[in-house]
Amino acid sequence: MKSRFLFVVLGYDCSKVAKDCDTKNERYFCLTTACVLRKIVLVVYFCWVGLDMSMFLKRAAIGAMALMLSSTTFAVGNERIDSFSDAKKKLENQVYTEAVNRVTIYCAAKYDQRKNVTRPKGFKLPLNRDGEPIHEKRAKRIEWEHIVPAENFGRAFIEWREGHPLCVEKGKSFKGRKCAEKVNRTFQYMQADMYNLYPAIGAVNALRSNYNFQLLDADTPSTFGSCEMKIVDKKVEPPVRARGVIARTYKYMDGAYPAYKMSRAQKQLMDTWDAQHPVDQWECTRAKRIEKIQGNENPIVKAQYQKAGLW
């Protein structure tokens, strides 16, 4: 009976309690409260079985320290750069400064300082009904892709959904991204967050749109020839090379901004991709540079490198 009770208490995952709390502050409170309650139950247990309380208290102190240093990480978002245009310029001039790192996220296409793309061998654009390549002009240059699409977090803002008294042009009111960008400071910060921006071939960025990432059937063909980016029925499966970066970006945005929240299925997929595809040196260097410019860290990336002693 006693051993079974101990097994249940020790097997309880405190972090699960925090998953349904809405904001990062609420998640921290939920997590801390749940784990403190677990420790109280353990005190009762040790009294019940008559173990040395002084030894238990020492172990409890160690456990509390481990909790503080646990892998449950809460990010703080961008509060310095409020212009999407400025964010793109800073990425181009202060982050992607070496030619070796000027490579697009999905198709590994190289590009120059003027954003001109060298398409990978075998890269193809899908064709329209007239047999012409779609977004041919945009395929020649890179664009800064929101990994978590602006629309997916923008819909949380009333200015996006309904407009605002200040969102009027030539006597006509407007809403959507243009309105949120004009009047909502939080949206401005989220849209300009450099951790969420990666270079992509313009045509790929256009066709990805605001569709969510997921796994498609194994026999689904690539949409772009040799670039293993698959887009079908408003669903997107990214190439293997991009999955770790995508996962850590989604997890960062989910932790940093209460306005954005992943679904349970998304969280499970991103946790899987994060574990399967660890960070590399460039992802670490990129995060360091952005932290210096933007003023906030990306703890999702940073925690992995600190664990490996590489930060």
Language-model segment annotations:
Residues 2-3, 19, 24-25, 39-40:
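Polybasic, lysine-rich low-complexity intrinsically disordered segments
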Residues 39-52:
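Short, Lys/Arg-enriched N-terminal segments with co-localized hydrophobic residues
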Residues 54-64:
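Bacterial N-terminal signal peptides that target proteins for export
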Residues 70-73:
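N-terminal signal peptide c-region/cleavage motif recognized by signal peptidases
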Residues 76-141, 270-272, 282-283:
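Aromatic-lined ligand-binding clefts that engage carbohydrates, nucleic acids, or primary amines
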Residues 132-311:
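Domain-level detector of nuclease and nuclease-like folds
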